[in-house]
Amino acid sequence: ASACRVDMVLTLCMAGAMMLLESWQERGRKFGLPWMAILLMSLGTLTKGPVAIVLPCAVAWVCALLRREGWLRETILMALSAVVSLILPALWYYAAYQQQGDSFLQLFMEENVYRFLGKMSYQSHENGLWYYFVMLPAGLLPWTLMVLPVICKRWNMQAVRERFRNMDRTEVFSLVAALCVFVFYCIPRSKRGVY
């Protein structure tokens, strides 16, 4: 239990929301909004911040765009889902602000906005853009050694493009989710190995 972190709860909420959004899209967006995904995004936001809304909505939006499912409709649905997901956290944040005042607001801004923008009032695990490109393979050793022959092999770009075109829905979702999360966490200057 000493190794448990709030990041694990955030990951549970985000992964669950991503899968529920994907399932909702696959079923033709029936039954209005994806209420369980919205609840998980709200809980994730209470756990660690708005990233729990941003990433699942971004993954669902990119997947829909790649499938040519209508960018305007998807933009509206994801924006609406994000706004509804903010209701529960907004109530909590309002109560916290009423109790703590500007110190709560400053902490929220410091941990969510300034950390992402690299404008924190203190140095917090600052690493360059390259950090996760090194840490991910290092963290997956010795299995990354098995990937070296694939990386060193001369690639047939036509075959690679064809492979991407023939991906099924689940493969597209998995690839988009992994890439969106990886790229998102590479952006902030504050990076840690636990992310």
Write out the residue ranges for each language-model feature:
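Helix-capping/transition residues at the boundaries of transmembrane alpha-helices
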Residues: A1-A3, G44-T45
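Transmembrane-lumen/periplasm boundary regions of multi-pass, lipid-linked membrane glycan transferases
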Residues: L40-L43, T47, A52-V194
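Short acidic/glycine- and proline-prone juxtamembrane loop motifs at membrane-interface regions
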Residues: S2-V9, G193
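Membrane-embedded alpha-helical segments of multi-pass membrane proteins
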Residues: M8-G16, C57
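Membrane-interface transmembrane helices that cradle and orient dolichyl/undecaprenyl
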Residues: A17-L33
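The feature captures the transmembrane alpha-helix scaffold of multi-pass secondary transporters
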Residues: P34-L39
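Residue-level recognition of membrane-helix boundary sites in multi-pass small-molecule transporters
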Residues: L10, G32-L33, V51, Q106
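Alpha-helical transmembrane segments of multi-pass inner-membrane proteins
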Residues: C13-L20, V150
